[in-house]
């Protein structure tokens, strides 16, 4: 036994000398030379020889235990006293130095005792040599000093936050101590340092938030908050572990932004409303950047954005309504005001789309806010006129020759058409818009001979992209009819040149319209003057050569005539409607006619005739003289050709005040809606077979909302009607459930 111990002690004395030399090097003892290769090999060989003897002369266990004791002694006798005597930043520097020394010590000793790692630790499932060294430091040094180190680091971070310069490299190395003592995991860093950092940061920024909120405006506060977040991210990059960033940022965001969100965003003098009011786009962009990463952080901003747009848009509607109800406003003035309103809404939309795109980075929340705001005021009426009609009138105005009021160039017109379509998105009654648009389109195509076909088709293409082919099918059909009408006219002229017997004595142009495409018009059995009868019969003869299956129905209300009025002073070219022309041509054969005589000869209704005679005798151009002279037409009146009439122009257009078609259009749309609701209900029930009342109504609204917002009461009425017509039936056990009857 004595011999055995002597071998172990002799070998260990060699190892102790090597360990002592290494520790002197680490402690920077003057004149201590480094290891030479022979010394390193001697130490390795000593361990090898002690651990490769056959039992009972294998000293692996004893050497392994004494290896661990080396660290315990070094940490207790050298490392801990050196760190304990220092404080604050100096203590941190010593801790960093000792951790660096520990890593060197472990690396060198692991090399000297390498044979243990290769065989002993593996066979016995013992901690590796490196683990033994680091566990010793963790248990003896780190556990005692981590709390003091944490306090010192937090103090330095506080100084840096207050603007002082600190040694960032030192902090990075201290953080490495926390991470390294987790033995490959971050648990020590997270529990012993990070959790306290997050708590301390929350307290720090909570205090700052209270102070900044009292001292600063919303824009200035946001600048400080944004800078704080930037610095905290920079702090992580410089010396904290990367996994800390999302946690630290979340803490700062919570204290600087979430906790004070209501006070900050809704600040009466400088919050979101004020920024929107004063067009502070940079500040709004900053508000977006700050609140975008926070869950639901943008909700109050988007809500205020919506409110602001709604207020501005509603103010425009109110302004237009007041102008429209002004008793001093003329009819033409009202039309101009309507067009001004649409231009204002387009400009408003352009303005806030810039906000959405540039300030709010096209975020869907702000697109939604913009849409909902515009839907509020774009569906209000202006002095009883629906926005659908106003928008249709605006389209009509800019598509007329010369761009109507706005006098737009081609490029500007195309851009304006795109913006009109964007406004149409927000109008609920798109079917009503379609009817008003189609009615006005018909008049443009028929009477605006110099209209731009390209822009007409361009707008319909945009409508189709937005609302589908069904929305534009009739409108496109009208354009096709106008193209075919030119072909018909060319063929008609050729027909007349071949058939010499059919001499008209005047220029006669006919436009053939397809009934299904065009709006419905009132037809009358007007007794045409003989001059017109010949023309009509000639075209009938021509059309009969083209088709036998189609019947022509003449719509005189859409026709125009150019008459040569031979007055005493000069001949004036008079442009009138077909009806007006029929009245005037009666006076070619007589100077005077009574109301009753005109009524009988033309076969017109009282209302229509009164309107015609009023336009010819009571308005600007008094081509007929009425007796007695009054502003109203009576069935006892007599009319005489006014040979004394004259005008400075050689060509005049005698207007026929249009009848108010609004009521009829609305009635037609309501009728079409009933059919649409019926079709949607049947389609849904045919697919679902059995469905509850609430779900059926809900699905019906969803089906139809693209074109109009169906009235719930109307849907219920249509359901009852379908039940009475045996399309649906109520479930006998549950009256709120419907069944489809095939």
From Swiss-Prot:
The keyword Manganese does not apply. Signal peptide: none annotated. It comes from the Eukaryota. Residues 672-734 form the Cullin neddylation domain. It holds the Pfam family Cullin_Nedd8. Gene3D superfamilies: Cullin Repeats, Cullin, Chain C, Domain 2, Winged helix-like DNA-binding domain superfamily/Winged helix DNA-binding domain. There is a cross-link at residue 686 (Glycyl lysine isopeptide (Lys-Gly) (interchain with G-Cter in NEDD8)). Neddylated; which enhances the ubiquitination activity of E3 ubiquitin-protein ligase complexes. One of its GO terms (molecular function) is ubiquitin protein ligase binding. One of its GO terms (biological process) is jasmonic acid mediated signaling pathway. Keywords: Isopeptide bond, Ubl conjugation, Ubl conjugation pathway. One of its GO terms (cellular component) is SCF ubiquitin ligase complex. Core component of multiple SCF (SKP1-CUL1-F-box protein) E3 ubiquitin-protein ligase complexes. Involved in ubiquitination and subsequent proteasomal degradation of target proteins. PANTHER family: CULLIN. Belongs to the cullin family. Interacts with SKIP17 and FBW2/SKIP18. This is Cullin-2. It comes from Arabidopsis thaliana (Mouse-ear cress). The lineage of its organism: Eukaryota, Viridiplantae, Streptophyta, Embryophyta, Tracheophyta. The gene is CUL2.
């Amino acid at each position: 036994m004595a011999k055995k111990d002597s071998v172990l002690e002799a070998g260990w004395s060699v190892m102790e000398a090597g360990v002592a030399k290494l520790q002197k090097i680490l402690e920077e003892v003057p004149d201590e030379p480094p290891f030479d290769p022979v010394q390193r090999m001697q130490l390795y060989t000593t361990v090898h020889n002690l651990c490769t003897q056959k039992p009972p002369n294998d000293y692996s266990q004893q050497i392994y235990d004494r290896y661990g004791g080396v660290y315990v002694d070094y940490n207790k006798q050298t490392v801990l006293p050196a760190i304990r005597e220092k404080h604050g930043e100096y203590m941190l520097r010593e801790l960093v130095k000792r951790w660096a020394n520990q890593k060197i010590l472990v690396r060198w000793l692991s090399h000297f005792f390498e044979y243990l790692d290769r065989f002993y630790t593996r066979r016995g499932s013992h901690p590796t040599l490196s683990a033994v060294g680091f566990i010793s430091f963790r248990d003896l040094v780190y556990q005692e000093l981590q709390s003091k180190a944490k306090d010192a680091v937090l103090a330095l971070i506080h100084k840096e936050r207050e603007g002082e310069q600190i040694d960032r490299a030192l902090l990075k190395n201290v953080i490495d101590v926390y991470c390294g003592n987790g033995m490959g995991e971050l648990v020590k860093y997270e529990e012993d340092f990070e959790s306290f950092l997050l708590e301390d940061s929350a307290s720090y920024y909570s205090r700052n938030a209270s102070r900044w909120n009292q001292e600063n405006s919303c824009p200035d506060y946001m600048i400080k908050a944004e800078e704080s977040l930037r610095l905290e991210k920079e702090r992580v990059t410089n010396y904290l572990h990367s996994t800390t960033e999302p946690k630290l940022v979340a803490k700062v965001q919570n204290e600087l932004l979430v906790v004070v969100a209501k006070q900050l965003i809704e600040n009466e003098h400088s919050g979101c409303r004020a920024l929107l009011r004063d067009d502070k786009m940079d500040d709004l962009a900053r508000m977006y950047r700050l609140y975008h990463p926070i869950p639901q952080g943008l909700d109050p901003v988007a809500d205020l954005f919506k409110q602001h747009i709604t207020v501005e848009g509603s103010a425009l509607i109110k302004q237009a309504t007041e102008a429209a109800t002004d008793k001093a406003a003329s009819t033409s003035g009202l039309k101009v005001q309507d067009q001004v309103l649409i231009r204002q809404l387009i400009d408003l939309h352009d303005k806030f789309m810039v906000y959405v795109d540039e300030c709010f980075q096209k975020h869907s929340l702000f697109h939604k806010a913009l849409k909902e705001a515009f839907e509020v005021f774009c569906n209000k009426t202006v002095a009883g006129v629906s926005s659908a009609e106003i928008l249709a009138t605006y389209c009509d105005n800019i598509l007329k020759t010369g761009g109507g009021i706005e006098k737009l160039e081609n490029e500007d017109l195309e851009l304006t058409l795109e913006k009109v379509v964007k406004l149409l998105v927000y109008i609920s009654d798109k079917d009503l818009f379609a009817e008003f648009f189609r009615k006005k389109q018909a008049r443009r195509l028929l009477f605006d001979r110099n209209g731009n076909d390209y822009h007409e088709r361009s707008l319909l293409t945009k409508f189709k992209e937005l609302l589908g082919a069904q929305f534009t099918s009739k409108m496109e059909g009208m354009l096709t009819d106008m193209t075919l009408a030119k072909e018909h006219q060319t063929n008609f002229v050729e027909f007349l040149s071949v058939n010499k017997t059919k001499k008209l004595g005047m220029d006669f142009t006919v436009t053939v319209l397809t009934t299904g495409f065009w709006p419905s018009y009132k037809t009358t059995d007007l007794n045409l003057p003989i001059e017109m009868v010949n023309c009509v019969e000639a075209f009938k003869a021509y059309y009969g050569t083209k088709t036998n299956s189609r019947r022509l129905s003449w719509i005189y209300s859409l026709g125009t005539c150019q008459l040569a009025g031979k007055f005493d002073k000069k001949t004036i070219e008079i442009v009138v409607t077909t009806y007006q022309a029929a009245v005037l041509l009666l006076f070619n054969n007589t100077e005077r006619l009574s109301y009753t005589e005109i009524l009988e000869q033309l076969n017109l209704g009282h209302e229509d005739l009164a309107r015609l005679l009023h336009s010819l005798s009571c308005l600007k151009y008094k081509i007929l003289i009425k007796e007695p002279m009054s502003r109203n037409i009576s069935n006892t009146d007599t009319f005489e050709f006014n040979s004394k009439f004259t005008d400075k122009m050689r060509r005049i257009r005698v207007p026929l005040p249009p009848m108010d078609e609004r009521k009829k259009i609305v009635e037609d749309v309501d009728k079409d809606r009933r059919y649409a609701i019926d079709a949607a209900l049947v389609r849904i029930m045919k697919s679902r077979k059995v469905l509850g009342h609430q779900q059926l109504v809900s699905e019906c609204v969803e089906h139809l909302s693209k074109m109009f917002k169906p009235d719930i009461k109307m849907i219920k009425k249509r359901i009852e009607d379908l039940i009475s017509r045996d399309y649906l039936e109520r479930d006998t056990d549950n009256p709120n459930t419907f069944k489809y009857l095939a």
